[in-house]
Structures are given as C-alpha cells and as structure tokens.
Regions:
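N-terminal extracellular/periplasmic Venus flytrap/periplasmic-binding protein-like
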Residues: 10-13, 24-34, 45, 167-266, ...
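Conserved beta-ketoacyl condensing-enzyme motif
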Residues: 25-95, 99-115, 121-139, 192-211, ...
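Active-site pocket-lining segment
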Residues: 155, 188-191, 276-346
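Condensing-enzyme catalytic core mediating Claisen C-C bond formation in acyl metabolism
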Residues: 1-28, 223-290, 294, 301, ...
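Conserved catalytic cysteine-centered active-site region
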Residues: 26, 60-114, 145-152, 220-248, ...
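Glycine-rich loop/linker segments at domain edges
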Residues: 12-19, 105-161, 219
Length: 394
C-alpha cells in the first residue's frame, strides 16, 4: 500500500441557513466550485497542473434540486476544471465529507490515482432537510419510525442516558464561547476562503459582503438565555432539546487535497496529515447520536491506540445531548482540547460538508496546539457513527 497524505485544506465560512443566510444567493454547486479553485490555488496546482487531478469526490446529502444530479461532477465543471477530471458524489449523511476523504485515501493507496480533491457541500437554505421525503411506510416494522426526525433521536439520547437540560445548555454555551474566542483571535482566518456575496439586507434588498467568518456564532448568549428556550422537538414535561442546544442548519463547502507520496515529491507539495484509522459503525437509529461513542473505540482498536494517546478531539455537536453523552462515555468531557474552537452548535452543521470542514480545521489546529494525534468523529443520521484518527506529519 502506498503512503498517502493530506496536503492542503480550505473551507468557506459557514452561513446560517434561512432567508438571511449569507449564501442565500449562491448555489451549492457554485459554492463547491469556489472551494475547489481556492484549494488548488493554495496548493499551487494551477494552469496545466490542474490536469493532474485524477478525481473529485464531493460529499452531500438530500441530493435533490441543485444538490442533485451528481453535484460532484457539476462542481468540477463549474470550477473550470479540464473535462478529463471526473467527479462523483458520496452520501453518508453527516459523515459524507469524511467518507469522501477516506475513499480518496484508499483509492490512492491502492495505486488507482495520485491526486484527488475530496470534500463536501451542503446548502440547507436552498435544499432543506426533508425536501421531497418519501419514507417507506413499512419502516416501523424494522425500527422506531420516528428516527427520521433527528431532534427526536436527540431527545431519546437525553432520556435514555439521563442527560439533563442543564448539562446540554452548558455544553452549548461553551461551544459559542470557544467559537467566538477563536474568531476574535483570528484562528479561523487561514482555513476560511473569503467569498464575495450578495447577502440579504434588512430593507429586503441585498448588499455586497465578503463572507470570511462564520455567521451563527452568538457571543451574546448566556446560560440564562439558553434556559428560557422551549423544547422544539417534543413538548412533554421530559423534553430538553431546544434550538439553543442543537446544531444550526447551515450552508457551506469544504475540501482537502489528497496525494500520494510520489505526487507530493513531484509537485513540491508538503504532507501535513496522515490517516491512521477510519471506522464506521451502525447503532440503533432511535439513538443515532451515540455513534461517536461506538465508532471511536473501533478506530482506536484499528490503530492499536488508547484514548490517552489522543491529543486533540473534534467531535461534531449535532446536539448537546449526544455530545455530552459521547464525551462522558469516553471520559473526555473535560479534556482541554475537546472542540477547542467550538463545533456544530456554534459554527453550524452543514451535513455533507461537516466531515471535510473538521478535517480542514484540524489541519490548522494540530500544529497550533502541538497535537501529534487527533480524532475526528460525528454521529450520522439513521443510526451510524464515523471516526478518523489523524497523525500530524507536517
């Protein structure tokens, strides 16, 4: 098997989906095309060198409308890539962006390619979750049919494992504070590709803006404000999951450049990250949020490593209930480098993009914090979990 590395990564800022999204007037395929071009420019893959890209793997879910018809290929064409560069789309829901990276690494390791762009995109303003949903009426014969609601599964995690409202709100508050601090200190600046956009204005029109920061971070939130929010997915006396302790729906794109050791040498690139292990698991769909607590031990076993050897943790915050459960189960809830710059609750969770967004963030976090090994993980809709162990080699 050949040696394979991540050599560059870039993402857009994450816009808060809805009528006021900063990316409301940019299509998903155009957003992905911007990231493809930004990635190659940062890596110095310009001009005729672009022909050396063997493939483009793009993750996404709810693959309809502008997210449909193989957006991976569409975005490749819209980026002005040579027609000889193919593209495909991968859907493992919340882990799609990480799955594309693992596919790219495996493809290159097998000797079938040398240079692949892998990433993800999601535009939840233009293609909301549930668009044209057609769930099988026999679903209830196989699992809890309510599992199609991610918020319902978050409530089930909270109830089954006694995750209090206070714990959830505390976790959410910390996410916003960490993300705000990182933004103020400019820690996201290098990973974000500035995007010129016509953003919605307060008067109903639009205004020009360079989008270079994440839209959903709330530095003014407080535990008191979070405590006042009403549950949104269930309304009985046991309900604890609110908009404040759930991830935001988002619009964003991210991509990394994956290359063989030989291609890195040929093009004068610099290896940064190496995939040590990658694991996916299935869990009860009704409590899909526990996925990381199952996937991470599987990845550690693959690598022959222990939790104590991991320096930095990036576990996506789909919901505070599941993030609290997973981190407590793993014994890392108070780890000093657990989501050190916030995650899905504060930054947003652009489903198919998130895995690539986290990998890109890690590319900048690992050298900053002096981390040798890092874990990236997320729960995945319909009862799955994914986890990757990264080694810094830069």
């Amino acid at each position: 098997m050949r040696e394979v590395y991540l050599v560059e990564g870039v993402r857009t800022a994450i816009a808060k989906a809805g009528k006021k999204s900063w990316f409301a007037n940019i299509r998903a395929d155009d957003l992905a095309a911007l990231v493809i071009n930004g990635l190659l420019e940062r890596a110095g893959i310009t001009g005729k060198k672009r022909e050396q890209v063997d493939d483009v793997f793009l993750g996404g879910t709810t693959l309809l409308k502008e997210m449909g018809s193989n957006i991976g290929r569409y975005a490749t064409i819209m980026a002005g890539m040579p027609y000889s560069v193919p593209g495909c789309t991968v859907d493992r829901m919340c882990a799609s962006g990480l799955q594309t990276i693992s596919f790219a690494i495996a493809t290159i390791a097998m000797g079938w390619a040398d240079l692949i762009i892998a990433g993800g995109v999601q535009h939840m303003t233009h293609v909301p979750m549930g668009t044209c949903s057609d769930h099988n009426p026999r679903l209830g014969e196989f699992c809890d049919p309510n599992m199609v609601s991610m918020g319902y599964t978050a409530e089930m995690v909270a109830r089954r494992f006694n995750i209090s409202r206070e714990k959830q709100d505390q976790f959410a508050y910390e996410s916003h504070m960490k993300a705000h601090r990182a933004t103020v200190e400019g820690l996201f600046k290098e990973e974000i590709l500035p995007v010129e956009a016509e953003v919605p204005a307060d008067d109903g029109g639009t205004r020009k803006m360079v989008v270079d920061r994440d839209q959903g971070i709330r530095p003014d939130t407080s535990l008191e404000a979070l405590a006042k929010l009403k549950p949104v997915f269930m309304q009985d006396e046991k309900a604890t999951v609110t908009a404040g302790n759930s991830s935001q729906i988002s619009d964003a794109a991210a991509a990394v450049l994956v290359a063989s050791k030989e291609k890195i040498k040929e093009l004068g690139l610099k290896p940064k990250m190496k995939l040590v292990a990658y694991a996916v698991v299935g869990v009860d769909p009704a409590i899909m949020g526990i996925g990381p607590a199952v996937a991470i031990p599987k990845a550690l076993k693959q690598a022959g490593m222990t939790i104590e050897q991991i320096d930095l943790w990036e576990i996506n915050e789909a919901f505070a209930s599941q993030a609290v459960y997973c981190t407590e189960k793993l014994g890392i809830r108070n780890h000093p480098l657990l989501n050190p710059r916030g995650s899905g609750i504060a930054l947003g969770h652009p489903l198919g993009c998130t895995g690539a967004r986290i990998a890109t963030t890690l590319m900048h976090e690992m050298p900053y914090y002096g981390a040798k090994f890092a874990v990236e993980s997320m729960c995945v809709g319909h009862g799955q979990g994914a986890a990757a162990i990264w080694e810094w080699v830069g």
